[in-house]
């Protein structure tokens, strides 16, 4: 029977070989963490390679995602549908083994990692989801939600500021089933880290309220195993500090940055094989090593045992069992569509001139009663973002049965935690901050779009309309940057009806994130027919039309729709034929068929004006070079909102004059 070291060396060999064949990659971390991975995956991780979606599996996150050959080797050796040919295709076009682990490619990859610090933060979200689902569904004698979240991370993750945001919150909330392994190898790309990373990391995590196990030999299986056992027994999140040698087994490159991010080279790989006593050719794993690694039988047994537990739970608590299944499957309640449409129709029938952030809160109030899977939150701005509703109950360390997270001032952490919650399953997460401060969270929203996961962000105070707080808080280019992100659904509604439609579609959207952008100031509700209400879901529609073919089209979003309507009324009174198009979601409008888009924006009507209190340049694709844009071309100013709108040209007079110049 092969020794533990020999089993770990299988990871080292595959990692060296994969990087060498690709002629690029990172062999150092997989070789350094192979012993830890062997102990965790063979001795502790509850998973089933035949069903990577088993609901109560332990989650494993490789936060130092550049070491991707580690997880690909583990998945292959354990029996997942990841063949040796897939490993040979590492980093090649359309392979299941991209350079960094990507969710949705290889089975068993729980999240996309690579941007350092986000993996540990996703893991915090997964652990929060586990604790919340357990609090909501477990019953005495029925622990049907009961699993750990394990994460590997390196010095780079710990240097990234997001690790502070996430790990601080994890300690505050007492996430006892979160176990992190710090790959303390003292090396980063530039060399030895003591010149730029001399923190006392164990003390840092103790200050967060974590259980810290210091100075574990990352190449000693017994020490690693004892640390994991101690971690599992402690009610706090645990940091296991594993001292490792980067590139372990490479005689001339281990312990240096030379093995971090480049192939070892044929000569050094041969020397490493000799040093490790690994006598097999590239990509060749002996049968006895495969047999020891194979987790299919044990995994199927564990899942079968859990299925029996779930059947007993379902017999005792049929309603709860059906509800848990629905939520884990990502299904909406049976009456959702009918009730949601009725709510929207009622809003249209009962006009209210309110801020769209208030309209958003009203939508939460109406929809939230149907959605126990909501997991809301805000980055310390709940009274401003209006993200709490009557059914909101805050999560606390000793009571996780609620549905609202106080993230504190942690925009980036909040957004990446929400990605983890969404990936875990069982919840529809929404979070919030001022639109200006989505900048802090941008990369996590990009990751949500890349992974195609549901992450609903409420971004309020959407323009110079927030007024006196000034340009530090007034967004200008942010809406455009969200719209330019692939697979991002971005909504800027003009009233309570469009706001409710935006919320409904964000709740229904399971294949990507949604940015819902709301105003601080009150907005007038627009009259609509039932057909127009239905057309809101198309992202852009004719809100007010001319008699006969229009000679001018005004396109507007959010707070500027009201302005466009008033300008159109004045121009119409002066004999002009003017159409107003409300376009709350440009990406959604762009997905409509050509006939619909042509019906709304006829190509032979070239006199067009776009009006939005955001960066002007975005709108050229809709108005053309012959059109006009009334938008922002500079940062804002500190002043009352009405003065700012006048100063920057968002007035009926300016729209009317611009239209007349265009039509002249």
Swiss-Prot record:
GO terms for cellular component: cytosol. Substrate binds at residues 26, 260, 357, 384, 461, 469, 520. Keywords: Calcium, Magnesium, Metal-binding, Thiamine pyrophosphate, Transferase. It catalyses: D-sedoheptulose 7-phosphate + D-glyceraldehyde 3-phosphate = aldehydo-D-ribose 5-phosphate + D-xylulose 5-phosphate. Pfam families: Transket_pyr, Transketolase_C_1, Transketolase_N. Homodimer. Belongs to the transketolase family. This is Transketolase 1. The lineage of its organism: Bacteria, Pseudomonadati, Pseudomonadota, Gammaproteobacteria, Vibrionales. The gene is tkt1.
